[in-house]
From Swiss-Prot:
Keyword Cell membrane: yes
Family annotation (InterPro entries): UPF0344
Keywords (A to Z) from UniProt: Cell membrane, Membrane, Transmembrane, Transmembrane helix
A Gene Ontology cellular-component term: plasma membrane
Topology within the bilayer: Multi-pass membrane protein
Name used for this protein in its record: UPF0344 protein Sca_0577
Family to which the UniProt record says this protein belongs: Belongs to the UPF0344 family.
Transmembrane segments: 1-21, 42-62, 69-89, 99-119
Superkingdom of this protein's organism: Bacteria
One Pfam family, short name: DUF1516
UniProt source species: Staphylococcus carnosus (strain TM300)
Subcellular location: Cell membrane
C-alpha cells in the first residue's frame, strides 16, 4: 500500500501543477483543465484511501513510537489535499490564489519531509531504524 501511496502523491503533485498552469493569459481555463482536475480528484481519493489504510495498519500494530508524527503527517496530508482543491477552484473563479498556491507547496514539502523521516521512509531504511 505504501507504493500506491507514493505513486499517487507523485502523480497528484504533477497533476496539481499542470492543472494550475493550464489557464490562458486572460485567466480562462483551457479545454484540458476539466479532465486534469477530475483526474487530480481521482488521485486525491487514492491518496486519502491509501493514507488512511497506512494509518490504520500502523495504529493496529501499536508497537511503534511514532504515532504522534504519523498523526501530524496525516493532518498535513489532509491539509494538502484540501489546499490543492481550494487553490484550483479559487483560480478558476478568478479570486486570489497565489498565496494558497505557495502555501500548498510549502505544506507538500513539510508532509514529504515527515514521510521521509517516519519508519518505512527512505532515511529510516537507509540507517536501519526500526520501530
Amino acid at each position: 500500500m505504501l507504493h500506491l501511496h507514493i505513486f499517487s502523491w507523485v502523480i497528484g503533485i504533477i497533476l496539481f501543477i499542470v492543472s494550475y498552469i493550464s489557464f490562458t493569459k486572460t485567466g480562462a481555463p483551457k479545454k484540458a483543465y476539466k479532465p486534469l482536475h477530475m483526474t487530480l480528484r481521482l488521485f486525491l481519493v487514492l491518496i486519502l484511501f491509501s493514507g488512511v489504510w497506512q494509518v490504520v495498519e500502523e495504529f493496529a500494530t501499536a508497537t511503534g513510537s511514532t504515532h504522534m508524527l504519523l498523526t501530524l503527517k496525516m493532518i498535513c496530508g489532509i491539509g494538502v489535499v484540501a489546499l490543492m482543491e481550494v487553490t484550483l477552484v479559487r483560480k478558476q473563479r478568478g479570486a486570489s490564489h497565489k498565496g494558497l498556491f505557495w502555501g500548498t507547496i510549502a505544506l507538500i514539502i513539510v508532509t514529504m519531509a515527515l514521510g521521509i523521516i517516519l519508519p518505512g521512509g527512505p532515511i529510516s531504511n537507509m540507517f536501519v531504524i526500526t520501530k
